[in-house]
A protein has these predicted regions:
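Nucleotide-sugar donor-binding/catalytic module of glycosyltransferases
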Residues: 1-217
């Protein structure tokens, strides 16, 4: 079973476009687990208005993006997810994102993370760049030795990655005090399992003034 997990917080402005892009994936067999992190705007009523049976809505108090995603990982594991894909509330997924990434995560013998390239858009949805990997000068290792590279340059964005069940089980107890979940999980995969890069753009990642961090929005 595939689980897409999303943490929301005061995201009503961009959320409909992202939800629609996820729910219109060409690979349709998945659940979308959404945890609202104590929003004070219209995010929760908006989410309640979606009737797609694949959506699982959790409403909680504000604990911050990292802890919120930790709770989502636990829920995905509890529901038996074999693959988990992280989803920001303000991006736009290309229609075949899951279809392109799912085959790469069928491996079950080792903890594995797959991440892809992406393009960028601004707050108005205007395309601001093509390949992020190329424009940022990311040095993606060709030999599969990701651990030292990730220590020097944490370039795995959660919004563009997925993990298998083995890595999910290693990610259920994220340490307190880490800034974001994606770097920690990527380092865990690189040290104890496998990391694979898909050199294709699978999402439009939105950079705007309200992103959760300068690297990646919540």
């Amino acid at each position: 079973m595939i689980a897409v997990i999303m943490s929301t917080y005061n995201g009503e402005k961009y959320l409909p476009q992202q939800l629609d892009s996820v729910l219109r994936q060409t690979l349709e067999d998945f659940i979308l687990i959404i945890r609202d992190d104590g929003s004070s705007d219209g995010t929760v009523p908006l989410l309640r208005g979606y009737t797609d049976e694949r959506i699982v809505l959790l409403e909680g108090k504000n604990v911050g993006p990292c802890r919120s995603f930790a709770l989502l990982l636990q829920e995905a594991a509890r529901r038996g997810a074999q693959q988990v894909y992280f989803c920001d509330q303000d991006d736009v997924w290309l229609p075949d994102k899951l279809a392109r990434m799912e085959p790469l995560l069928r491996e079950t013998d080792v903890p594995k993370l797959v991440f892809s390239d992406f393009s960028t858009i601004d707050g108005d949805g205007v395309r601001t760049g093509g390949s992020y990997a190329a424009s940022a000068g990311l040095r993606i290792p060709q030999d599969g030795d990701f651990f030292p590279k990730l220590l020097a340059q944490p370039y795995v964005f959660g919004c563009a990655c997925g993990i298998n069940r083995r890595l999910l089980e290693l990610s259920l107890d994220l340490p307190d005090g880490i800034e974001m979940y994606d770097c920690w999980i990527a380092l865990t995969a690189a040290l104890l399992g496998k990391v694979e890069y898909l050199p294709e753009q699978t999402i439009q990642h939105r950079f705007h003034s309200s992103n959760a961090t300068g690297r990646a929005g919540q």
